[in-house]
């Protein structure tokens, strides 16, 4: 193993309109087939629809949604002595944000609606109100971790 310094954590550049790193992380996760301008259009459309529907700052709603969806613990399958255990593990802040973004996007993709921008907007509003598919996913993960708390020493 190298004795050099540990590699620096990659940071994303803030987006041009809101000047926020969280939004650029979201854009990079929305991205499909290298079409970044389309990803920007989808996210900015979602932000404008949240502003229109709630009358509040969409960045504030996004932050609230991220707080409500970000998990504290996850379960990871670990094979010990021929049987597989679901071992609960704590999640770091960056990994938690990445999971929250992924869950928000998968929930909004599965949602019925006209276009991705409106579906993402409604999912953000629901998550900020503490309901919605992404929040349910976080609660299921926490329940699973609580149920398998006995295996926490297998880390």
UniProtKB/Swiss-Prot annotation:
Keywords: Plastid, Ribonucleoprotein, Ribosomal protein, RNA-binding, rRNA-binding. The keyword Isomerase does not apply. Disulfide bonds: none annotated. GO terms for molecular function: rRNA binding; structural constituent of ribosome. One of its GO terms (cellular component) is small ribosomal subunit. One of its GO terms (biological process) is translation. It is found in: Plastid. The keyword Ribosomal protein applies. One of the primary rRNA binding proteins, it binds directly to 16S rRNA where it nucleates assembly of the head domain of the 30S subunit. PANTHER family: RIBOSOMAL PROTEIN S7. NCBIfam families: rpsG_bact. Part of the 30S ribosomal subunit. HAMAP family: Ribosomal_uS7_B. Belongs to the universal ribosomal protein uS7 family. This is Small ribosomal subunit protein uS7c. It comes from Aneura mirabilis (Parasitic liverwort).
